[in-house]
Structure formats: structure tokens, C-alpha cells
Amino acid sequence: MLFRPKPTPCLKDMTEGRTELARAKVNLTLHVGASIQSGKWRGYHPLESLVVFANFGDTLSFKPSRNGTMEFEGPFGEVLCDQENNSIWDALELAKAPPHDTTIDKQIPIAAGLGGGTADAAAVLRAFDPNRKIHPIKIGADGPVCHLSRTAMMEGIGEVVSPLPGLGQISAVLVNPNVAVSTGAVFNAMDSRLRDENPAMTARDGSLLSRALSGTNDMQDFAIAQVPIINDVLRALAQATGCELARMSGSGATCFGIFRSDAQATAAANAISQAQEGWWVRACRLGDDVQDIVT
């Protein structure tokens, strides 16, 4: 699947190609305040979120070339192949990247609450803006935390990111019913109910699981109202042996289940896959252990 993007301005060239892994993002908690009514961030929603990253993601490969092409591979590559405007191209323009042949192995579902598009854009910035002259908030609210790509607390409108090293990993299953959710529509539904600009707070100490259990995803009920099958996904995860928490990530529709062990997570993923052949299901680890990151 190949298309040729618009030419990019050539400021400098890299003599060798490079590869970046855009890890899937999961919001273990997501608290949302009422939209800001004045100032620089007027119209944005203040957020507070405990964010972790999976041990898989999209792989972006860049190779210097004269004109530059973009090729999508993987199970979700075909969805993006026909789109000239995508987050990767936008980030290449933002970074004023020189022409490269770019290959994207797309493993993260589209519009799924896993930050795939923003993670891809952040990977571009890591590759072509190593000195961080461009603030990652320019690629979206998830931009700064996806640029870090490590366990962190995200606050403000997403521009405040506090790394949380040393919390390790948890076993998990991610499930998406192959239904897209409109983030804008969910926020619009929330706006009629939100009154306080100050979002709730996640616990600041304890394990990843205990911190996750201390909070909620404020977008979950609103997303379910629009896409009821999300509730079926949550039920399937919650009923699986060893599941300690089932919750939606981001604005959905992907949900995660936290399990006591990798073995229980794998068993749950296999059972859900067999029961729901049309769903995307993946057992993984969430959190930071670089040696376990796979592509």
C-alpha cells in the first residue's frame, strides 16, 4: 500500500535510516473537567490521567530518499492508505523533515482510544526534532505523554507530564469491538453535564493497579451511550478469570482488563477472541520494561 505525499522542505538530511516504535497508549484513569472559559486554553478541557504504554505499537521506519514516499503495512494499514492527510504527514511537515521513504507497520487500531495517531506523530518528532524545538502539544493533547512514551501523570490540557519511573508492568488484555468512537462527540455530550473545571485526582502513591483503582474514566459512560457495545466489551473482560479491573481507555472504544498474571491474560484473550470473532483482542503488558517491548 503505497502513496507519494506532497514534497517536504529539505533543511537537512540523515545519512542513515532509523526506526521508531510508537507504543499504544492506555489511560488507566482519565478525569475530565469542564471546558476552560477564558485564557490561552479557552475551549479545551482540563485533564488528569494516569497513562501507561503497551509493549507493542506501530513501527515507523525512515530512509532518506530524493522524493519521499509513505507506505502502510500491518492489520490497520489499509485504513490509512487512502488518506493523504494523516497525523504522520502532519508531523513530518511540522518538523520540516527532509524527504524520506516512510514505512508504517500499523498495529494499533484506528480511532480506538489508544493514541495511535498521536503516538505515530510523536515518533516522527522524536526522529526529526531530537532537540525538542517543537512542543509536542502541537500534535494534540496526548502529544507530550506520547512523546515521552513512558508511564506518567498527564495534567493541564495534556501539556503537563510527570514521569513515574519504577512502577513496573502489569498484565493486561486490550479489546476493541472494531467500532470507532468520535472523541468530539463524547466531549460534546459531556459538556452539558460538566460544571467544575478541576478534574478528579488519581492516587499519587501505590502500585499501578492501586492507582488505577483509585480513579475512573469520566468519558466511559458517555461513550457507552453512543456506542453501547462498549458495555459488552467491559462485561466480557470483567467476567474473565483473574481480571482485577475492566475499564475503557481514552474516549474508546478500546477497553482494557488488568490481570494477575500473563497466563491469565493470555487465556482471557483467547477466550474472548473465540467468543467474538469480529473483535480485536490482544494480550500485552502495560508499563515500563524496555527489554520486553516488541514490535
Predicted regions and their residues:
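Glycine-rich beta-strand-to-loop/alpha-helix junction loops that act as flexible
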Residues: 116-117, 248-253
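Conserved, helical-rich catalytic subdomain that frames metal- and/or nucleotide-binding sites
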Residues: 62, 70, 148-245, 260-266, ...
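Phosphate-handling active-site elements
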Residues: 96-103, 126-141, 262-276
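Short beta-strand segments
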Residues: 29, 103-105, 138-140, 147, ...
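DPxDG-like acidic metal-binding loop motif
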Residues: 112-139, 145, 149
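Short hydrophobic/aromatic beta-strand micro-patches
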Residues: 31, 256-258
